Amino acid sequence: MTLAHRAVGDIRRGGFRQLRNYVDMCSSLAKRPQQKDFFAYAQKALQRTDSCYYSLVHNLLDTVDEDRLCTVGVNMGFGGLIYGASEMKKQADVDGKPFSWITAAHCGDPALPALVAAAEKKGSFVWVLDATEGDPSEAASLAKAFPKCAFGVLAAPEALTPDRVAQLAECLNVVVLPLLQSPELTPDVCHAARALKAKQMLYMLTVLVDDTCAEEACLLYTSPSPRD
């Protein structure tokens, strides 16, 4: 975690040149083909000075609590993609079966605590919890019980009330995923985004798209976050 905070501080001070330096360093240290491919893509994306990734990183550093950013980064990056995926790959080679480093489940399922505990032992630390038909704040108790995991909480924007957002904000290992039925920043979406931003939370607008609205979704992706 100390290294994560140091990296964030370096990028704050050194700007995007330092970001490229970190990506180059990680690329040189990558051992597995998937890791090499990931950092090769990151290098390519950062070659363009007008890349939307620069504004994305700048926005993250300005609006997201640093402890939250580092916790999610370590839990997902190291726990999920480096250590966890390597452990699951070993077992997959023995079993001869494919594996996934991310698991989806229904938020509030009473079986989840036991399932998450069992998954941790196998190297699985990243979850997406579907709360689109319920109360997204139910994820808070699970996230607190498993601080080494990262939880993405998929929720309807109108369900992300200030009170529920406040409960989720107590968990540094949660990423909120407001689900948009179309690439449109409706009043409910904007209200949810403002509530999340007020708590310096990490969130990603998640859009359901098909061929008819894919281009519109790309424009939404490159737009600034909803503002007051």
Could you tell me what each predicted segment is?
Residues E216-L220:
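Catalytic cores of alpha/beta
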Residues I102-A114, K121-D135, F146-T161, L168-P187, ...:
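Core AdoMet radical
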Residues M1-A45:
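Long terminal accessory regions outside catalytic cores
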Residues M88-D93, L115, R164-V165:
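Short, charged beta->alpha transition segments
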Residues K197:
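Cysteine-centric redox/oxidoreductase cores and disulfide-bonded domains
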Residues Y41-A105:
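N-terminal [4Fe-4S]-dependent radical SAM core
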Residues V116, A139-A143, V165-A166, V189-A193:
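Generic structural signal for well-ordered alpha-helices
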Residues Y221-D228:
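Conserved small/polar residues in nucleotide/adenosyl-binding loops
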